[in-house]
Amino acid sequence: MEVNVINIESQNIGKIDLNPLIFSVNYRPDILKMVVEWQLSKRRIGAHKTKTIGDVSGTTAKPYRQKHTGRARQGSLRSPQFRGGAVIFGPVVRTHAYSLNKKVRNLGLKVALSLKNSCNKLLILDSIDVNFVKTAQVLRFIKNFEHQSFLIIGKDYNKGMMYSCKNLHNVTLLKQIGTNVFDILRHDCVILTVDTVKYLEDRLL
């Protein structure tokens, strides 16, 4: 499958073959859901915690005598049934991350890239190494395409490209080693460099 390769001036400078095993995979929303949930679970801090009876401060004295009061026996005012007492079965500090099969993760990436390609929201750029710092130049480039947000993925980017995109809220730069399903789906248009296409073919095949 041949697609055009463009430069930062939005000019066609050649063509590149995209492997259909990566860029023309059947749409699988179930796989995308699994991978996105896996990614988001790894981002959670898991710092939530409530106090157990060992954490609650307060007296250790028995509230009242064991017998002959007509009330239920109690041994501590820090028990869960009292106001200001402990919380039973409350959240504890833990990690929410879990493992996901590598084949599923790779398939999710293929499905996400294929989805963008099928919607004509995938562009191939020759390079993102520029020798200037001009936000206006990048702005002119993205205005040629009717998309809301852009994810630019490259092997690496220099300071010129980084500072040119820094003030654009709808443009995100990402190194190819960090290519992931969540970022691809949350941006309207994905721009890959030629080096990134080769990297993804080596990584996913």
Curated annotation (Swiss-Prot):
Q: Which Pfam families match?
A: Ribosomal_L4 (PF00573)
What GO cellular component term, any one, is given?
Answer: ribosome
Q: What does this protein do?
A: One of the primary rRNA binding proteins, this protein initially binds near the 5'-end of the 23S rRNA. It is important during the early stages of 50S assembly. It makes multiple contacts with different domains of the 23S rRNA in the assembled 50S subunit and ribosome.
By sequence similarity, the record places it as follows: Belongs to the universal ribosomal protein uL4 family.
Give the UniProt keywords, A-Z. Ribonucleoprotein, Ribosomal protein, RNA-binding, rRNA-binding
Q: Which GO terms describe its biological process?
A: translation
Q: How does this polypeptide assemble, per the annotation?
A: Part of the 50S ribosomal subunit.
Q: What is this protein called?
A: Large ribosomal subunit protein uL4
PANTHER family in the record: 50S RIBOSOMAL PROTEIN L4, LARGE RIBOSOMAL SUBUNIT PROTEIN UL4M
Q: Where are the transmembrane segments?
A: none
Q: Which InterPro entries match?
A: Ribosomal_uL4, Ribosomal_uL4-like, Ribosomal_uL4_dom_sf
Task: Identify the stretch(es) annotated as Disordered.
Answer: 56-76
Give GO terms: molecular function aspect only.
rRNA binding; structural constituent of ribosome
Question: Which cysteine pairs are covalently linked by disulfides here?
Answer: none
Task: Identify the taxonomic lineage of the organism of origin.
Answer: Bacteria, Pseudomonadati, Pseudomonadota, Alphaproteobacteria, Rickettsiales
